[in-house]
Amino acid sequence: MIPSDVSFNVLESWCGTMERIVIGETRINLRTELRNHGLSGFVLGERMKLMDYIRRNPEFLTSLEPIVVSEGPLIVRMMSRASRKAEVGPMASVAGTISQLSLMHLMGKGSRCSIIDNGGDIALVNNRKITVGLYAGSSSLSGTVGFLLKPGGPRGVCTSSGTVGHSISFGRADSVTVFASEASTADALATSIANSANGPDDISAVENALERADDFREHFRGVMVVVGEHAGTVGRIPRLVMTDRKAVLGDLWDEV
């Protein structure tokens, strides 16, 4: 999805100090144990490759349907692949793809603990347990529960919303969170599933979104959908834990 106003942060410094990278629409909150990682320059380069491709292929920016790309920069091919998996336009995965490429860059430099949050679309590898808080707009679940992530990765945790932020969504989910091995795919799937969160009432909206999610089970590990005071899951999501609402709504990441 296009970067939203949702943000995840790490409160403790065990995975490095918080860094902020802002380049155009890309707004990254970064935690990594690496120094002199050169991520800002890397992200700038990837954005330039994408923008150059869009100048020559403007439909890549505006299409709401998948676009097949056989040749082009890696960022473009990854977005194209994610769009085909999720049956959405390629720009639905731009934030998650940048997060994933950033993680690949850091892991290539030897990182064992890096968390890249690009407007709520996260790619990470972690060597300690982490709790990621659930931000679901005005729902009472927002900030009160989180997901306990075991050490592991690389993986993606991406969220789409029809009520929070400025991302394009045709549904009314407060949050659709997708857990997958790739942030690029998780981002596109979150958008696609959130688009189906409609119905005469909140329960129907959750059920319709979960039914849509079930179509994509081969591409994700788990999905959680929240609409108002109702929620549902498909697949296997990380263990839910209680979180401090005040802490989560300020900084949605915490060390266990």
UniProtKB/Swiss-Prot annotation:
Gene3D superfamilies: ApbE-like domains. InterPro entries: ApbE-like_sf, MA1715-like, UPF0280. NCBIfam families: PRK04334.1-1. Belongs to the UPF0280 family. This is UPF0280 protein MTH_727. It comes from Methanothermobacter thermautotrophicus (strain ATCC 29096 / DSM 1053 / JCM 10044 / NBRC 100330 / Delta H).
